[in-house]
């Protein structure tokens, strides 16, 4: 009788461990690899223009004058990271580094860049975090490696804006 109870207990325990492990791996994959709208640059621009139509003249002007620029840096682990940047309308020492949210990209935060660049006359640097936009990466980092990347972008800003 004890042997049968022990066998059943072991089977239940193994089933429970298997279920918890499988569920945990599923949730980890779900949280680190959600639908990546951050790689859809065209869709992101359409979203911005549809939801923030006041941005169109600003973005068009930046593009027409080649004032919206791209730059890349390489993180210490070899991942290539991308950012957009734009100068203030006159030389300025004020720079805003504007960071997008989870699963987004730099384009989806242009409305904040507009406020700083157009309204407050700041230089703006808007990076694509890992696995977003034109940046490389296999997973969203949920801020862990992104914090170091943002510090690297902050250190890069003076070289971009003088």
Task: Map each language-model feature to its residues.
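Histidine-centered divalent metal-coordination motifs
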Residues: 82, 100-101, 132
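Conserved catalytic-core motifs of eukaryotic protein kinase domains, centered on the activation segment
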Residues: 108-110, 135-138
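An N-terminal hydrophobic leader/cap segment in hydrolases
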Residues: 5, 16-72
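Conserved alpha/beta-hydrolase
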Residues: 116-136
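Short beta-strand element of the alpha/beta-hydrolase
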Residues: 93-101
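Alpha/beta-hydrolase active-site loop
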Residues: 140-161
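A short loop-to-beta-strand scaffold at the N-terminal edge of the catalytic core in hydrolase folds
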Residues: 76-87
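The serine-hydrolase catalytic nucleophile loop
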Residues: 102-115
